[in-house]
């Protein structure tokens, strides 16, 4: 998925956006 796509795998989202935890988009 693209950056910000909540359906993308958590790690992929965080890596995409340059964060180190999955809290980058949603707080779990």
UniProtKB/Swiss-Prot annotation:
Compartments, record wording: Secreted
Cystine crosslinks: 3-17, 10-22
Gene Ontology MF annotations: sodium channel regulator activity; toxin activity
Keywords: Disulfide bond, Ion channel impairing toxin, Ionotropic glutamate receptor inhibitor, Neurotoxin, Postsynaptic neurotoxin, Secreted, Toxin, Voltage-gated sodium channel impairing toxin
Domain of life: Eukaryota
Predominant cellular place of this UniProt entry's protein: secreted
Any single GO CC term annotated in Swiss-Prot or TrEMBL for this entry: host cell postsynaptic membrane
Tissue occurrence: Expressed by the venom gland.
Functional description taken from the UniProt entry: Insecticidal neurotoxin that reversibly inhibits the N-methyl-D-aspartate (NMDA)-subtype of ionotropic glutamate receptor (GRIN) and inhibits inactivation of insect sodium channels (Nav). In vivo, is highly toxic to insects.
Family: Belongs to the neurotoxin 03 (Tx2) family. 05 subfamily.
Entry protein name: U15-ctenitoxin-Co1a
Species the sequence originates in: Ctenus ornatus
High-level lineage: Eukaryota, Metazoa, Ecdysozoa, Arthropoda, Chelicerata
């Amino acid at each position: 998925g693209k950056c910000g796509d909540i359906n993308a795998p958590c790690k992929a989202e965080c890596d995409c956006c340059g964060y180190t935890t999955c809290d980058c988009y949603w707080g779990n």
